[in-house]
């Protein structure tokens, strides 16, 4: 019996060894390859679902891909190339050479070789002079991409911004003190903001003017030589969108996919320079938080940015709806006040006849009935519509307090809260606060001595923007023209 047990144990040991040997060499490698293939397919499936869920792209669309040569843009190019058969896209590649170093030319040749191998149209923009500042280089890069997209009839521009870039932008804006609009960081899809030349010159060329000058304008648009490149029409410019489908994919996932594909990429040397703030956030702040506070900080911040973006979109739509209702109630399309600026400056209290021209003003009673967050957004959007300028939080809060309380109370409360120097002045008063935290607000009166009340019709802000609170209405004056103009709010669909 003992011999039988020993033989059985020997047999089982030999049998296990015989089973393990081929499994360690062949089956394990096949299993690893299977996992890699699944990870590859999973990323394609993920990007395809993101495009469908957020309606980023449409079938048979002309797409321009911004490829810098780094791992993000190279991975994006490969994924869109694999999805091209399903969606029937017409792809194009654009590369911008900033001439920051001597290797930029080799990097451009590397991207051009990829375009040739994939048989995709290639466009390249080269800077005449090397730009050292990142902000100026970014503006130049976007202007080049927009001009190429408009002239070649592309309807979408895709960049390789990923979840890691979104987290870095969120933390950077948080340290700067941005609001919800800055905390949502990078959006999935947005309309491109065109250059000053496009907004000021090209938008003035209207179709009706061309019909009068060119009787053959209808055949001119459909001519084969132009191939639909009507870059001067506003309809074409409104169709151009900037899309980022990688906002849920981290930089480590992209790096792993490129190692699986064995696809060449060109790393950006400037990403390692710690003198740049974003690089310090990338290499020092985020790893420190990941080690000492939350190892899953990337997923947490991405989820937070998505929540902030959806709630910000709701608040923006609600604000536009309120402004639209104010406009419908007043039945105003566009009104101009034909009174010279000098006459308005001389008057301390405008007459009721002149105030009737300000029919698109915001009712103060309506503003008081809204929540505080909506009050600030309505004021900020209303000011931007009429003056094309964005005021900071302290100025918006100042106007809001002036609407809710009397001018004197709001002035004292605001200066006592912020302990700051004068922010708004008038023709008769100037205000300032003392350095001591316990002292009261000091008010210097420069007007006639017999008047003791702190009453002035105008609130003057930086840039010459003036506000008037009169008859329970808030009126606005923009210094661009010599007369008061009121524009119709632009409601986004």
Swiss-Prot record:
Chief location of this protein within or outside the cell: plastid
SUPFAM superfamilies named among the record's database cross-references: Adenine nucleotide alpha hydrolases-like (SSF52402), MesJ substrate recognition domain-like (SSF82829)
Keyword check for ATP-binding: yes
Residues that coordinate or bind ATP: 68-73
GO cellular component, as recorded: chloroplast
UniProt GO molecular function: ATP binding; tRNA(Ile)-lysidine synthase activity
Keyword line: ATP-binding, Chloroplast, Ligase, Nucleotide-binding, Plastid, tRNA processing
Gene3D superfamilies associated with the record: 1.20.59.20, HUPs
EC number(s) reported in the record: 6.3.4.19
Subcellular localization(s) per the UniProt record: Plastid, Chloroplast
Segments passing through the bilayer: none
GO process annotations (BP): tRNA modification
Catalytic activity: cytidine(34) in tRNA(Ile2) + L-lysine + ATP = lysidine(34) in tRNA(Ile2) + AMP + diphosphate + H(+)
Functional note: Ligates lysine onto the cytidine present at position 34 of the AUA codon-specific tRNA(Ile) that contains the anticodon CAU, in an ATP-dependent manner. Cytidine is converted to lysidine, thus changing the amino acid specificity of the tRNA from methionine to isoleucine.
Domain notes: The N-terminal region contains the highly conserved SGGXDS motif, predicted to be a P-loop motif involved in ATP binding.
Family: Belongs to the tRNA(Ile)-lysidine synthase family.
NCBIfam families according to UniProt: lysidine_TilS_N (TIGR02432)
Protein name (record): tRNA(Ile)-lysidine synthase, chloroplastic
Organism: Staurastrum punctulatum (Green alga)
Phylogenetic placement of the source organism: Eukaryota, Viridiplantae, Streptophyta, Zygnematophyceae, Zygnematophycidae
Gene: tilS
């Amino acid at each position: 019996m003992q011999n039988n047990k020993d033989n059985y144990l020997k047999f089982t040991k030999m049998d296990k060894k015989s089973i393990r040997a081929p499994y360690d060499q062949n089956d394990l490698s096949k299993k690893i390859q299977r996992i890699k293939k699944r990870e590859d397919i999973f990323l394609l499936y993920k990007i395809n679902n993101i495009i469908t869920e957020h309606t980023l792209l449409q079938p048979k669309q002309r797409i321009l891909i911004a490829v810098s040569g780094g791992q993000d843009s190279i991975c994006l190019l490969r994924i869109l190339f694999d999805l091209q058969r399903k969606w029937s896209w017409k792809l194009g590649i654009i590369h911008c050479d900033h001439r920051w170093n001597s290797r930029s030319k080799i990097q451009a040749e590397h991207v051009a070789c990829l375009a040739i191998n994939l048989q995709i149209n290639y466009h390249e923009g080269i800077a005449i002079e090397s730009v050292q500042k990142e902000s100026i280089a970014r503006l130049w890069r976007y202007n080049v991409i927009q001009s190429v997209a408009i002239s070649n009839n592309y309807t979408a521009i895709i960049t390789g911004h990923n979840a890691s870039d979104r987290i870095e932008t969120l933390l950077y804006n948080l340290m700067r003190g941005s609001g919800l609009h800055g905390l949502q960081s990078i959006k999935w899809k947005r309309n491109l903001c065109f250059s000053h030349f496009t907004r000021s010159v090209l938008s003035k060329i209207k179709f009706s003017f061309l019909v009068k000058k060119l009787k053959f304008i209808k055949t001119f648009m459909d001519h084969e030589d132009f191939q639909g490149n009507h870059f001067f029409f506003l309809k074409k410019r409104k169709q151009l969108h900037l899309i980022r489908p990688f906002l849920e994919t981290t930089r480590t996932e992209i790096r792993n996919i490129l190692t699986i594909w064995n696809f060449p990429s060109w790393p950006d040397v400037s990403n390692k320079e710690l003198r740049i703030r974003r690089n310090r956030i990338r290499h020092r702040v985020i790893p420190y938080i990941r080690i000492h506070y939350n190892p899953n900080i990337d997923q947490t911040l991405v989820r937070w940015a998505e929540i902030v973006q959806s709630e910000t979109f709701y608040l923006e739509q609600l604000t536009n709806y309120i402004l639209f209702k104010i406009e419908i109630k007043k039945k105003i399309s566009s009104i101009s006040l034909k009174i010279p600026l000098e006459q308005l400056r001389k008057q301390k209290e405008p007459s009721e006849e002149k105030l009737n021209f300000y029919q698109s003003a915001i009712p103060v009673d309506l503003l008081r009935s809204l929540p505080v967050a909506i009050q600030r957004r309505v004021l900020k959007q209303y000011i931007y519509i009429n003056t094309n300028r964005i005021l900071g939080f302290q100025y918006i809060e100042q106007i809001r307090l002036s609407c809710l309380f009397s001018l004197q109370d709001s002035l004292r409360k605001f200066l006592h809260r912020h302990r700051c120097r004068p922010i708004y002045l008038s023709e008769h008063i100037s205000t300032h606060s003392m350095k001591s935290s316990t002292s009261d607000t000091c008010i210097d009166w420069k007007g006639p001595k017999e008047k003791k009340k702190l009453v002035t019709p105008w609130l003057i802000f930086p840039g010459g923007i003036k506000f008037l609170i009169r008859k329970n209405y808030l009126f606005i004056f923009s210094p661009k023209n010599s007369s008061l103009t009121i524009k119709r709010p632009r409601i986004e669909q």
